[in-house]
Amino acid sequence: MSTEQFSEKYYGVVGMSGMSVRQGDTAIAHGSGDVPVLATPQVIALAERATIAALLESMEQGQTSVGIRVEFDHISAASIGAEVRAIATCTKVEN
């Protein structure tokens, strides 16, 4: 498969992942803060699960994907019991 065909196959695919925030998901539990809200490492893991969901159906046996950059903004805290979701869209393919 050419680089162009590879890019066309994955560009624009979308995946989603969701979770309910539990005690073990908090900044306190992860040692990344002192408030009982969703920890940043958990936010990144949620985003990675959305990325996997986006690419999984398009990948062939033996293929995988790795993240090379993470950029996000905290726009609101998520307390225990909150339902949160991540949506991933493939906007660039690098080989």
Describe the predicted segments one by one:
Residues 12, 79-80, 87-95:
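HotDog/MaoC-like acyl-thioester-processing domains
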Residues 24, 52, 91-95:
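Short coil/turn motifs at secondary-structure junctions
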Residues 39-43:
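A short mixed-secondary-structure module that forms the rim of ligand-binding clefts
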